[in-house]
Amino acid sequence: AGVATHLPDIGGRIRSTGVREIFEEGLQIPPLKLFEAGQLNETLAAMINRNVRVPDHSMGDILGAVAGCQMLGIKLNELLTNEQFDLRALARILQGRSETVMRNAIEAVPDGTYNHVVRHDGFDDRIVIDCTIKVKGDRMDIDYAGSTEQLPRAVNVVPSYTFAYTAYGVKVLLAPNVPNNEGSFLPITTTAPEGSILNPIYPAASGGRGIIGHMLPSAVMGALAPVLGNRFGAEGSANSSFTMTGQHAGRRYAVINFLNAGLGATAEREGHSVLSFPSNLGNTPVEMMESLAPIRIVLRRRRSGSGGDGQFSGGDGLDLCFEFYGEEPAVCSFISTRRIVPPAGANGGGDGACGTISVNGQEIDPAEHQVLRKGDRIEMLTAGGGGFGKPQA
């Protein structure tokens, strides 16, 4: 069993795209045993606790993840015992079937080379993702030569993440209903030049890699759009987040909260509102936001009209406004996307609205940390999804 989770804090500077190398991003833990023979590695736990702002929360979440893995192991063993399954044989069958379906789906795509370029807001310059797909028989090779070089910012995407979100884009287009396992991805390869934003050289920072990595499915869809009819959708947006740390009522806090944007429309339906693609994160509940940090939610509502026009409109983004009431200042940082380059419409559909972040009515650069004082108000508007097809008269 395995689990991936966001922790409230891992040390270093608080999470933002503004950090310039991995050493600012907190703990780097090589493969070590947290438990051995059922016993917690107290030395490792002490090291983690000493280097994070909220050790009870961070270690509590880690142990919660461990408990989840243990429960999955128990239930899997029960299933295998009760049903008399051979796990290895079952895995081979499932992976083999998934591989066959994916290879057949790729074979149905005409052999050839397909290209699409997507652009991100960037910092001093726009970030370019140049996606070239070569289809030959039952294989698909995706190359990102021509993409932006790695940056001294926390948006670099490590190769495993590049592959994961590229392969995901292929899967949702060609074989969305097949079980998600290694077999689905054996016919797919990805390459990116070393030193590029999709294959950075250590110690490049990558804590905000999602805002670039989550654009890769759109790059894949854009490249294959000419041969896939109306199976692709208009662009949406990765989610945004804000992280806050400080001290209130005698205790230290560190929290991370997520906000979704609008989903792009398709040839069959309007985009869902406040549902980022391809994110698998929900919006943080208001009750959690207010209970973990000294903030008061002034409003949280659908950002009406932010989706792009079209035969089918893009989904609307989110409008969130909160007020900070802590007696002591707090440091707040943001990870945000689609503030300059909007989610593109498709087949004549309109672009979605860009997102913005403002403090006391003044738009800010989300890459810069903000110091909040009592009474400060922050408003975050996430982007709307692109529309699909020309609007009907």
Where are these regions (language model features)?
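Glycine/proline-enriched, intrinsically flexible loops and inter-domain linkers
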Residues: 1-393
